[in-house]
From Swiss-Prot:
PANTHER family recorded: DUF538 FAMILY PROTEIN, T31J12.3 PROTEIN-RELATED
Organism lineage: Eukaryota, Viridiplantae, Streptophyta, Embryophyta, Tracheophyta
Classification via SUPFAM superfamilies: At5g01610-like
This protein's name: Uncharacterized protein At5g01610
Length: 170
């Protein structure tokens, strides 16, 4: 009789423990979906999901690695919707070797596809005045910025990451 109670008790405790572990896993998943930025990165790391570095992701999608400032290392990328959110520590301007300048706010979002970033929010470029960039696309030798009108620039100017200079406002 003791053996039967032991087996039933062990089975019952095992079932309870599995439910508790499943509950903890579900809690981690719900926490992960309800928080932003670096915290989400940390939760994903705890869960075992490691993100590739931002330059690697950009290269995979055929975009130059220097489009974003060098200190833009935290990002979120939804594989299903292709939404990219890049977190930048402070509003900054980045100058490139072709003398172009981009200004970044602390959160840049867009829709990432092979060779292009569309529906961009959070980037401006200087064309006599600061103009909002709405899309970035590439081919073998050029990067095309759409900011009211489409403007092409030499791709090699954006192949090296550069640091941004902190500015007061976007």
């Amino acid at each position: 009789m003791d053996q039967i109670f032991n087996k039933v008790g062990s089975y019952w405790l095992g079932q309870k423990a599995n439910k508790q572990f499943d509950s903890v896993g579900n809690d981690l998943n719900s926490v992960s979906t309800s928080i932003e930025g670096g915290t989400k990165w940390l939760v994903n790391k705890i869960k075992g999901k490691m993100q590739k570095p931002l330059p690697e992701l950009l290269k995979e999608y055929d975009l130059p690695i220097g489009i974003f400032p060098g200190d833009a290392t935290n990002y979120e990328f939804d594989e299903e919707t292709k939404k990219l959110t890049v977190l930048i520590p402070s509003i900054c301007e980045v100058g490139y070797k072709d003398s172009s300048v981009l200004k970044f706010t602390t959160t840049v979002t867009g829709h990432l596809e092979k060779g292009k970033l569309t529906d961009v929010e959070g980037i401006k470029t200087k064309v006599m005045i600061w103009v909002k960039v709405t899309s970035i696309s590439t081919d073998a030798s050029k990067v095309y910025f759409t900011a009211g009108m489409k403007k092409s620039r030499s791709r090699d100017a954006y192949e090296v990451q550069r640091n941004g200079l902190r500015v007061d406002k976007f």
